[in-house]
């Protein structure tokens, strides 16, 4: 299972803005867009390509790269928090088809002091046709207990895409562990792996509720 933690200064700079309680709503939303764009370019480097030859305006032939997988991308947005993140992904991957998944959830308190299990119901999904050539990106800025993501993965896996990318800004150690146990072959891209969950299921140190901070 490829795990990519984007711990470069630019991504950590934007992560720090998101974590700060002093960051206003507009800046928070725009920062999610910026990180989405950066992550989108990282995904481009992981797609399949061919070496081709082109002719320049000076009549000289030059070898280059054609990323043919650009035509086979589906982005799934976990509503509503992923909306700005997906906006950024689309700036890097403008030909992607777009789908959405919306879920309601109820925390179930168990041991260890935080919601270890969660009842999740997918009450809406609109997903374009997916085939064996497609690269599917599932975007959710915060993955805490991973119950929603596991439900989404269950839907997407049945469609047998070429590969699946999970895109987040922060994922908890516990959420990461749950995903790896059930879907060890997915690609996970994140900016930070945070160590804890509180008794409400919030990631610590985290950044609060991404949807509320982005949209009010």
Swiss-Prot record:
GTP binds at residues 30-34. Keywords: Allosteric enzyme, Glycosyltransferase, GTP-binding, Magnesium, Nucleotide-binding, Transferase. Transmembrane segments: none annotated. Binds 1 Mg(2+) ion per subunit. The magnesium is bound as Mg-PRPP. GO terms for molecular function: GTP binding; magnesium ion binding; uracil phosphoribosyltransferase activity. Pathway: Pyrimidine metabolism; UMP biosynthesis via salvage pathway; UMP from uracil: step 1/1. Its EC number is 2.4.2.9. InterPro entries: PRibTrfase_dom (IPR000836), PRTase-like (IPR029057), Upp_A (IPR034331), Ura_phspho_trans (IPR005765). Uracil binds at residues 203, 208-210. It catalyses: UMP + diphosphate = 5-phospho-alpha-D-ribose 1-diphosphate + uracil. It comes from the Archaea. One of its GO terms (biological process) is UMP salvage. Pfam families: UPRTase. Allosterically activated by GTP. Its cofactor is Mg(2+). 5-phospho-alpha-D-ribose 1-diphosphate binds at residues 80, 105, 140-148, 209. It is an enzyme of class 2 (transferase). Belongs to the UPRTase family. Catalyzes the conversion of uracil and 5-phospho-alpha-D-ribose 1-diphosphate (PRPP) to UMP and diphosphate. This is Uracil phosphoribosyltransferase.
């Amino acid at each position: 299972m490829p795990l990519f933690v984007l711990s470069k200064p630019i991504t950590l700079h934007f992560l720090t803005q998101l974590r700060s309680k002093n960051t206003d709503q507009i800046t928070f939303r725009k920062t999610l867009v910026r990180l989405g764009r950066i992550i989108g370019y990282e995904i481009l480097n992981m797609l399949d390509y061919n070496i081709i030859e082109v002719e320049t305006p000076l009549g000289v032939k030059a070898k280059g790269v054609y990323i043919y997988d650009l035509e086979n991308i589906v982005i799934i947005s976990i509503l509503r928090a992923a909306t700005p993140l997906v906006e950024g992904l689309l700036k890097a991957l403008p030909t992607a088809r777009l789908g959405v998944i919306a879920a309601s959830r109820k925390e179930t308190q168990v041991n260890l002091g935080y919601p270890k299990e969660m009842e999740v119901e997918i009450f809406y999904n609109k997903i374009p046709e997916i085939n064996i050539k497609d690269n599917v990106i599932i975007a959710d800025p915060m993955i805490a207990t991973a119950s929603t993501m596991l439900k989404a993965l269950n839907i997407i896996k049945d469609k047998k895409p070429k590969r699946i990318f999970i895109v987040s800004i922060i994922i908890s150690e516990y959420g990461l562990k749950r995903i790896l146990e059930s879907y060890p072959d997915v690609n996970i891209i994140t900016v930070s792996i945070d160590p804890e969950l509180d008794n409400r299921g919030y990631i610590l140190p985290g950044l609060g509720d991404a949807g509320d901070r982005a949209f009010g």
